[in-house]
């Protein structure tokens, strides 16, 4: 039996430095940090620790309204990876 290797055909990412591959790649090239004060929830350590929070409204970006925030972030990244791969799911 021959070995089978995975192949990356598309990329999708959402992070504190950007909401797509181009924005994040630009942040890497320019040395832009995504660390900033926490805004999504209250914390007793507010202002003491910088956070890499994704503060965008995920539903506005096209995420489903159901599921956890982690589900929504994963869905957005997967959607971009599928589009980047040129796969049409319709």
For the regions a language model picked out, list residue spans one by one.
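Conserved "HGTGT" condensation-loop signature of ketosynthase/thiolase-family condensing enzymes
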Residues: 1-90
């Amino acid at each position: 039996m021959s070995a089978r290797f995975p192949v990356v055909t598309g990329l999708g990412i959402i992070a504190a430095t950007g909401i797509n591959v181009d924005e994040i790649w630009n942040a890497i090239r320019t040395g832009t940090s995504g660390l900033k004060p926490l805004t999504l929830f209250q914390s007793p350590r507010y202002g003491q620790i910088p956070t890499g929070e994704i503060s965008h409204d995920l539903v506005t970006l096209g995420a489903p309204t159901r599921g956890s925030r982690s589900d929504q972030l994963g869905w957005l990244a997967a959607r971009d990876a599928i589009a980047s791969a040129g796969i049409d799911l319709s």
